[in-house]
């Protein structure tokens, strides 16, 4: 698995019901709280307004790629 870093775009692999988030929602990593736990901001694509912030363990995240040459 690729290492997740601050500013990476990630998707949830599991629901996070305590924050009203569902599997597949996409967010941006904004901080790393402790080893393997990341603060992720979820925002509305149309407005850019954040609708949720959640501390999510790495095992519930998948790093997303948008350029073919970055995926390996």
Predicted features by range, described:
Residues 4-67:
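Basic/aromatic-rich interaction segments and small domains that mediate binding to polyanionic partners
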Residues 68-72:
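Short intrinsically disordered terminal tails
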């Amino acid at each position: 698995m690729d290492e997740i870093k601050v500013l990476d775009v990630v998707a949830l692999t599991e629901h996070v019901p305590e924050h009203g988030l569902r599997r597949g929602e996409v967010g941006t990593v904004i901080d790393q709280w402790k080893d393997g736990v990341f603060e992720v901001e979820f925002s509305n694509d149309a407005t850019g307004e954040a609708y949720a912030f959640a501390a999510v363990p790495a095992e519930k995240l998948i790093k997303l790629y948008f350029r073919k040459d970055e995926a390996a």
